[in-house]
A protein has these predicted regions:
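Conserved small/polar residues in nucleotide/adenosyl-binding loops
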Residues: 177-182
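Phosphate-binding loop of NTP-binding sites
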Residues: 33-175
Length: 182
């Protein structure tokens, strides 16, 4: 009801649809559906760029910045999303989360693509995965830095198993290249 009063024309919900005077979409996972809809409404901007997702307990920011610098040195126009904010040539914005909420993220990716970025390096936090902030993005490359028992507790993850689950979620749909005999 608050969303409709603020001007929303549709509501996503997980349970029986409330009578709010607007279109209601009942879905098992409203956050995931919001992310997928945001991607579609923004024209699926991630498809226009090489998307590189970086996850791990430590080293996401350093790794993301190094990857962006390597791509830039190769002549690529690169966007970067993470702990230090979001930036691409001529633009810089602060963020509230390492991995922004899906609607904000998709709008930022759209701006990057429209400004000619052909690659985006993105820190993908475990909470970003848990709350489906990156749902709807098909990463071309996934980077895993490491895993240690941090981010366990109220407001984050209940235990290490949950933390591991959300870290691994970045690689749920991936191909592994294993030509090395070792």
């Amino acid at each position: 009801a608050q969303a409709v009063a603020a001007g929303a024309v549709a509501v996503l919900c997980a349970g029986p649809p409330p009578d709010v005077g607007a279109a209601v979409v009942e879905t098992e996972n409203p956050r995931r559906m919001m992310a997928v809809l945001a991607a579609r409404l923004c024209g699926e901007p991630a498809r226009a760029m090489t998307m590189i997702g970086v996850t791990g307990t430590k080293g996401k920011t350093t790794t993301a910045h190094l990857l962006a610098a390597i791509l830039q040195a190769d002549g690529r126009r690169v966007g970067l999303v993470g702990t230090n904010g979001v930036c691409w040539p001529g633009h810089r914005h602060d963020l509230n989360h390492t991995t922004p909420e899906s609607c904000d993220l998709q709008a930022l990716l759209r701006r990057m693509a429209d400004d000619g970025c052909d690659a985006c390096v993105m820190e993908v936090s475990s909470l970003g995965m848990k709350f489906d902030r990156a749902a709807g993005i098909e990463f071309d490359v996934g980077v895993f830095t490491n895993l240690s028992p941090d981010h366990i507790g109220p407001g984050e993850h209940a235990d290490f198993a949950e933390y591991l689950h959300w870290k691994a979620a970045l690689f749920q749909h991936c191909l592994l290249y294993t030509s090395d005999a070792a």
